[in-house]
Amino acid sequence: MNGEKLRIGFIPLADAAALLVAVDKGFAAEAGLDIELVREVSWSNIRDKLNVGIFDAAHLIAPVAIASSLGLGHIKVPILAPFCLGVNGNAITVSPTLYAAIAAAADGDIRDPMVSGRALARVAAQRKARGEEPLTFGMTFPFSTHNYHLRFWMAAADVDPDEDVRLVVLPPPYMVESLANKHVDGFCVGAPWNSVAVDLGIGFILHFVSEILARAAEKVLGVRSAWAEENPDVLMRLVRAHGRAAAFIEDPANRDEVSAMLAAPNRIGVTAEVIRRTLDGRLKVAPGGTVRTSERYLLVGRAQAARPDPVQAAWLYAQMVRWGQAPLSTDLLAGAKAVFRPDLYDAALGKTQSPSAGEPADHIGAFAGPGFDANDVVAHLAAWKIGRR
C-alpha cells in the first residue's frame, strides 16, 4: 500500500471504533495513510510508546494525554488531542454478591447513583465493623476516567475511595478474569468488558457512567505536539479519516458491518452481538437478561462527541487536583485545556459548531453537586468534602 506510514496503538475497547473502522473500511487509505495498528493491553504501554515515538498516534485515555502534557506521574511529553474517539462508554459492574448486598442495603431504587452509593457506604461500614477486608474495585489507570468516575460516584455518597474501599489498577481485558477469580468486587471499565462479565454470569452492571456524568470525554486520538507541528498535513488527513469513520459508525444501517469488523480477533476479539449491543446502547445488565437502554451510553459521532471540548479537559484536571495528583494552578489548568484542540478538528473537517440540543449546560451534567465552571476550579473543589488536596 502506498501512503504516509503511521504506527498507531490501541486497546481492545469499543471506543477505538473510529480508529479501527478508519483503517479497516479504507477511509485512512483513501486519505493517503498507510496505518499499522498495534493492539496493546495496558495504558502504560500505550503512553510510553507514544511518548518515545514508537507510535505516531494512539487511542489514548483522555486524562493520560493531560497528565503527559503536564508532566504528572511520568516524563513530560506535550500531547495534542485533535479528535475525541468517544464520549461516555464506561460502566460500573459489581459481583453478584456485592450487588445483592447493595440491593439489600438500599433505601430506594439502586438505579439512582445516590441510592446505590449510600447503600455502598452502608455495606462498607458493615464490613469494617466485622473486621473484614475492604471492598476492592478495579480501574484501568491512576490517570483515568474510570478512576475519577468511581471516585466521583462514591464520594458524592460519602464513601471515601481511599479509606472505605480499595481501588486497584487492572488492564481493561483483565477486569473480567479478576472479577471471576474474586480478586475484585467490582470495576469500572469501558465496553465491551462489562457486557462480557454479565454474559458470563459473574457480574451485574450497576451504572452506566452516563448516569453519573451525562457527558464524559473518554478516549482521544493522541499525538505528540512535536509530531503534529512536523506533520500538519498528515494530521489533517488523519482527523478527516476518523471523521468519516465516526459518521459511518453512527449510521444504524452500518451497525452489523461495524460490529463484525470490531469483533475480529485482532481488533476487540469478542462476539459481534456484544459489540452491536454496545453501539445500540442496549445492554443486558444482569445475568438473567434484564436490559437497560441509553442513547447516551457511547457517543462516537453524535452530539458533537468527536469534537474535543476544553471544558472536559478542565473537569479532568479538577479531578487530578481533588485527588492529590496535581497542584492547583492557573497555568496547569490552561495547559490541560490546551491539550483538547477543537481548532484542529474544525480545520480538518470544516464544520461550524453550535451547541447541541439536550446537552448539559455545563458540558458535564453530573448527577450530584453544582454545575461545573471550567474557569472556577476552586469553586468545584470547595463543593466536595471528600478529597485529597
Model-found features: residue ranges?
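Internal, well-ordered alpha-helical segments in soluble enzyme and binding-protein domains
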Residues: 146-149, 171, 175, 189, ...
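Short, glycine-/small- and polar/acidic-enriched structural segments
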Residues: 4-162, 185-197, 202-215, 377
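Secondary-structure end/capping motifs
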Residues: 233-340
